[in-house]
Amino acid sequence: MGEFNEKKATCGTVCLKYLLFTYNCCFWLAGLAVMAVGIWTLALKSDYISLLASSTYLATAYILVVAGVVVMVTGVLGCCATFKERRNLLRLYFILLLIIFLLEIIAGILAYVYYQQLNTELKENLKDTMIKRYHQSGHEGVTNAVDKLQQEFHCCGSNNSRDWRDSEWIRSGEADSRVVPDSCCKTVVTGCGKREHASNIYKVEGGCITKLESFIQEHLRVIGAVGIGIACVQVFGMIFTCCLYRSLKLEHY
């Protein structure tokens, strides 16, 4: 009877080992995906960060990159701990899983909170940023971001093209008789911003605020979904690890 129980325990341990190994392979790929989403946000979608008053959007992307790297390292460690049957490595693996779980939950919560606050932040700060920093020395990032925003989303001004009348760049005379930046034009040519007409200038209801808000909210949904989704999957990893740890402990007695 004792021999049967021993074989049963050994069989259970082997099953858990292969289950955890399969999980770690999938987990490593998930880490790659998490890191890719973070890098994608930073590298391709960071042009508009200079237009945001809060650094929350940037922080969520950095958290995902860090979490992705740690996930990939943890996945390799998990495979080693599983096949070497080292309980101390399993303990370390569990702790790392817990840390990653918390990081991704934090990223998901930050994305959700910022999602709720985004509209208020843009209404309070975007117009001020555009009219005070556009084409001003030391704010080249804002200038490039505004030009790209207006061209990519076919909008002009924070709320509408009339916002540019309050621009320090326009009022200072440096705009060379322009009433709006050239990036407001449907067909951009040098000096096209001197003529504010519907046939020439983008007239979008809600202005660039609504366009930028929709853009960022879409990416916040991706960041939040990835963070929370992978965190939920990690719960299974922690359960498998605890089961294998307990199984190895029983075999030593």
Swiss-Prot record:
PTM summary: Palmitoylated. Palmitoylation by ZDHHC2 regulates CD151 expression, association with other tetraspanin family proteins and function in cell adhesion. Ubiquitinated by RNF128 on lysine residues present in the tetraspanin amino terminus via 'Lys-48'-linked ubiquitin leading to proteasomal degradation.
GO molecular function, one term: integrin binding
Cytoplasmic-facing ranges: 1-18, 79-91, 243-253
Extracellular-side segments: 40-57, 113-221
GO process terms (BP): cell migration; positive regulation of cell migration; positive regulation of endocytosis; T cell proliferation; wound healing, spreading of cells
Major location (coarse): membrane
Subcellular compartments: Cell membrane
Glycosylation sites: 159
Lipidation feature positions (S-palmitoyl cysteine): 11, 15, 242-243
Ranges annotated as spanning the membrane: 19-39, 58-78, 92-112, 222-242
Domain of life, per lineage: Eukaryota
Topology versus the membrane: Multi-pass membrane protein
Swiss-Prot/TrEMBL keywords: Cell membrane, Glycoprotein, Lipoprotein, Membrane, Palmitate, Transmembrane, Transmembrane helix, Ubl conjugation
InterPro entries, alphabetized: Tetraspanin/Peripherin, Tetraspanin_animals, Tetraspanin_CS, Tetraspanin_EC2_sf
Gene Ontology cellular component list: basement membrane; cell surface; plasma membrane
Transmembrane helix is among the record's keywords: yes
The protein's assembly and partners: Interacts with integrins ITGA3:ITGB1, ITGA5:ITGB1, ITGA3:ITGB1 and ITGA6:ITGB4 and with CD9 and CD181. Interacts (via the second extracellular domain) with integrin ITGAV:ITGB3. Interacts with ITGA3; this interaction modulates ITGA3 glycosylation pattern. Interacts with F11R. Interacts with RAC1 and CDC42; these interactions mediate physical association of RAC1 and CDC42 with integrin adhesion receptor complexes.
Biological role: Structural component of specialized membrane microdomains known as tetraspanin-enriched microdomains (TERMs), which act as platforms for receptor clustering and signaling. Plays a role in various cellular and molecular mechanism through its association with both integrin and non-integrin proteins. These interactions facilitate critical cellular functions, including cell-to-cell communication, wound healing, platelet aggregation, trafficking, cell motility, and angiogenesis.
Family (UniProt): Belongs to the tetraspanin (TM4SF) family.
Name recorded for this polypeptide: CD151 antigen
